[in-house]
């Protein structure tokens, strides 16, 4: 009997150990310290890319309609004189403005812009209201308090329309409903919500839940789908897979996110078309010219913005700027400097794709690697009051503090929403795989 008893004990111990191993494999462990550095990299990379892309914003939109801007920029224009945008008249002297990286030294301060300030506001609101999912009234309260009522308030198209509706007492998601907001298919949601992906590491399905109402505040249809694509990419940036390069990593993230685009809609077709151009070996300028011809001249794949005769031929539209962003995504190959350069020269709302990829790549490689790539030490100070209002400390913040605030959001999401754990001894998160 003792032999059988010992065998039973050994078998039970084996089953217990197997169960422990399985439970360990059911969790993904992420360093909170490393993640904080990555969030710093997100804000720094996004700021560099945003301010660089702003130099050429709306300089080049094509030659359809009343506004014609001539040939698009090419790599030969990098370092050259910045041409006038569609808003600038002949009285503006731009002879001393060059198309080059826009950087801030340690003594300077990064200013906010519409590609960073709404994300900053949403992070602030999540902690202010101690929640993981903002309610319609919380979003409206935040917009009314932190966005200036009078121009210049750095809102455009759908964001401005949603803000006007909020001031009339209308709550999200009705502010993005096509019957209320004729700009629902513009770019706005895809440049204001990417950060929600970083609040739900490795779990894009919950990131989409967090971002759903902020996205629907200004977008529907394909514009909503594009915004969700970016959110998904940012969530998958925390995946535990091992890659040989940032290029391999970001291409995997992109292809995984592509699986959730509807094959019947133009975002998926734009993705597949642009990826095919990249794989064909043609230069990025040829790829950019091809998407211009296909989507704005020929109106293929159901993208018919040109037929609507909009101002600047819909240069603010979600679709053409998404296609443009894919050019810098693929051809940038995960190199932050190369990606920002291509995005800046690609045309249309050039600060939008650059900001998105600058932030994502900045997150992937972190603060130190960004500074190594640019061979400089950057400012960590950030002035949210350049474009928004009513934040603490007269709007002066730092990337260190902004990263710490992001960690607070993730802590709450991991424990309360993902049913994971915070290991304060190891300073890690244990996040269930599902």
Task: Show the residue positions of the predicted features.
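Sec-dependent signal peptide recognition
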Residues: 2-11
């Amino acid at each position: 009997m003792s032999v059988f008893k010992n065998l039973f004990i050994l078998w039970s111990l084996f089953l217990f150990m197997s169960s422990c191993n399985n439970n360990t494999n059911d969790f993904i462990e992420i360093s909170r310290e490393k993640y904080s550095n990555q969030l710093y990299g997100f804000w720094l990379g996004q700021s560099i890319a945003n301010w660089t892309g702003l130099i050429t914003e709306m300089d080049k939109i094509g030659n359809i309609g009343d506004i014609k801007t001539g040939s698009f920029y090419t790599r030969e224009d990098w370092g050259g004189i910045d041409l006038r945008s569609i808003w600038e008249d002949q009285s503006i002297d731009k002879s001393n403005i060059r198309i080059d990286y826009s950087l801030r030294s340690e003594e300077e301060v990064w200013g906010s812009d519409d590609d960073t300030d709404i994300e900053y506001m949403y992070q602030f609101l999540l902690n202010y209201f101690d929640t993981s999912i903002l309610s319609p009234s919380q979003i409206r309260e935040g917009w009314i308090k932190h966005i200036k009522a009078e121009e210049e308030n750095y809102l455009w198209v759908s964001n401005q329309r949603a803000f006007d509706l909020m001031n009339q007492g209308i709550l999200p998601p009705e502010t993005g409903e096509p019957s209320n907001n004729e700009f629902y298919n513009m770019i706005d949601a895809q440049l204001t919500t990417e950060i929600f992906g970083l609040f739900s590491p490795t779990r894009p399905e919950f990131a989409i839940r967090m971002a759903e109402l902020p996205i629907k505040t200004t977008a529907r249809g394909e514009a909503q789908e594009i915004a969700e694509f970016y959110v998904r990419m940012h969530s998958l940036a925390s995946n535990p897979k091992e890659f040989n390069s940032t290029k391999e990593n970001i291409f995997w993230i992109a292809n995984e996110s592509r699986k959730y685009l509807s094959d019947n809609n133009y975002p998926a077709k734009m993705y597949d078309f642009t990826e095919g151009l990249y794989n064909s070996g043609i230069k990025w300028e040829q790829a950019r010219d091809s998407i211009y011809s296909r989507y704005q001249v020929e109106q293929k794949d159901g993208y018919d913005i040109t037929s609507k005769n909009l101002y600047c031929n819909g240069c603010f539209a979600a679709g053409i700027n998404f296609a443009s962003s894919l050019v810098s995504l693929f051809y940038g190959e995960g190199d932050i400097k190369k990606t920002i350069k291509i995005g800046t020269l690609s045309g249309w709302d050039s600060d939008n794709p650059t900001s998105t990829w600058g932030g994502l790549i900045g997150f992937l490689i972190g603060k130190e690697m960004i500074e190594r790539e640019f061979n400089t030490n950057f400012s960590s100070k950030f002035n949210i009051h350049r474009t928004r209002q009513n934040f603490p400390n007269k709007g002066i913040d730092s990337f260190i503090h902004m990263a710490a605030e992001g960690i607070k959001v993730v802590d709450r999401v991991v424990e309360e929403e993902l049913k994971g754990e915070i290991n304060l001894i190891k300073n890690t998160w244990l996040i269930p795989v599902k």
